[in-house]
Amino acid sequence: MATLGGGCAFQIPNLQKQDGQTKPQRVKISAAPQAMIAIPLRQLQPYGFLDSEQQEWVLSLRGHPIPFWVIDDEQPHLVFYSPATRSQYWRENVFLLEPKADFIRSPDPALVDLIWIPALPTGVLDHLSNGIALVTMTMEENQIYQALSEGIHWFWRKLQNNQEQIITMLIEDEPLSEVLLRFVLYSATEAPAQPDHVLKITVNDSFIKEIFWDGKGWQQIEVSIPAQSIRAGKNQLTLFVPGLEGVFAQLSFLERIEVFYPQELPPQADQVSFLAGGNLQEALMGYDQTQKWLWRIDNALSPEQTKPGVALSIDDVRRYLWVKEKGFRKASKIEPLQQLSNENSHSSEIAYIAIGTGELLKPLQPLLELRQAGGLTVTTIEVEEIYDQYYGFAEAQALRAYLAKAARQYPALRYVLLVGDTTYDPAQYITSAEMNRLPTFFIDTIYGGQTSTEIPFAIIDQDNLDFLDTLATFEPSLAIGRLPASSPQQVRQWVEKVLAYEKGEKKPKTKAILAIADPQEATFERDATAFLELWKGQTSIESFFPNAGETSLEQEIRGRFDRDYRIIAYFGHGAIDLWGKDEIFTAQQAKELDGQTSYPIVLNFTCLTGYYIHPEVLSLTEALLWNPKGGAISIIAPTSLTLADDQSFLWKALVESYQSQPDGRIGDVWLSALPKIALANEGIRDVVLTYTLFGDPALTLP
């Protein structure tokens, strides 16, 4: 395997003991899925891994031990199989390699659902015989996000009326007979006509076929392509959506194409997976096992290196992976696991934790010092340290597991500030790492499809996330605040605002409450009036209820921010970056606010204004937070579409909680409000799940 040398340019740590020997250290390995990986031992030796000691080490995937081999040649390599996994949080698998004495078996019960294995094609036995295998491959790219699809939300290509999509299909060897293509797609439209969808498939301009189906939802459609229409190498696959009589629009999203084609054994490709039945001895007789390897991968977590002479019935179909010397894939990253720096360094009095990347936590320091001086015992933790304690993946579930542990370790823990932006693309298919600093949870809602929720971080006494759909009320243990920052500058400017507020410079001097109603519907004015009625006799109240069609509403609302209100509450239609169908106040206008007397708390009883997970659109919430000269100090806003009647349960609970602790903190209001809301229907549940507290949960109330 000398030709496998080179590997990747990994940073090599200095782990030498005083006696000159290498101290074993736990290692995190990132690798592409659905591939056999080889790592030169010289890249692992600095961490203490030696060929002679391989039995003293454990390789694991999400707590599940994974078999590995040391293939010893001129340059020995550690070899293991990286199975196909599917998660919205990652593109690559993360394996932990650690001394056996350090390994704690804790397999993730959800791992079996993360492993993906393509279904056998129709009539698979018709394609197999002694010496003939069915090569399998999957073509997909996650390029298009669709919140409203069911289950899977990432797609490769959009298929719509009179538009053409061209895909290059690479076939390693000329197929012996027909090639089977399985199209997996999601249809987003439907029509009374039957069928209401058609797709014209052309291969190399020599094969044309139209396929039809009916209705919305997922489709798996298999198409057989004659062998003479396919060539070894690049093939052009053209997809076109013709018009259909009685169908105004057709819209589908292609998720993947699974390819199956018969090939004579042994395979010619450097690394290829295939289906085969029967005894492979005759077909593979005489192959040089020192340069080619064969694994059975029916059990993706426990592949077996096999020899072709194993007796199997021709009807006993197995999955294999064939690898030549040059076919092994490389690991993309090898790095030591980080330990929790604050594991034993703080007392049980900790009441406030800030979590984020080191880069974003640094400018947060003045705020943490203020909270410490105000009587809260504070600590911080870098998010990478958390990931490395829980399987190594950058996922929200790791943060939740840590918070559950922290709550047991620190009984006084009450406030958690999550410092970092994220998007609906945490795996970074189409976005950057800067946009995905700290992940969140995703749920499916009634009207808006998939969106974010922070509730699982707050409720940590439940073993899994089933409680999101089953509990009659939510009783959070922790007040979670999200600061969706993507840069240190944003954190720094926001901290300066909070300091000015807490020191009294920008804290509202009056107790006035302002309610703004969208003029488009009478129900919004009704709700805003009812909201203000709850404050009567306790504080001064004001309303701004313009008439539909009025001009200059944006200037009117900007003027309201210049006044001294402790709370500004909006009731009405909304979108990610604005209030009102008529755009009565937008994110751009929020960015331009300047010279405010004070910074209010802003409550949004609308839709989507807290949808901070969009990678391209700045939400109204973010615009109000990041404005260094104005805007809001804390915001409660939704990441979803919900109904005004369902939102009313939230604003009633918030007012009651606020009034019961006027000298408390915004996080205290949030914690006491949620249990007051009976989750009587899915709409109310969506409201509670998707409304988010933005800013510091320990902010003192104005």
State where each predicted segment sits.
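Cysteine-dependent hydrolase recognition
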Residues: 9-702
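Bacterial N-terminal signal peptides
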Residues: 1-5
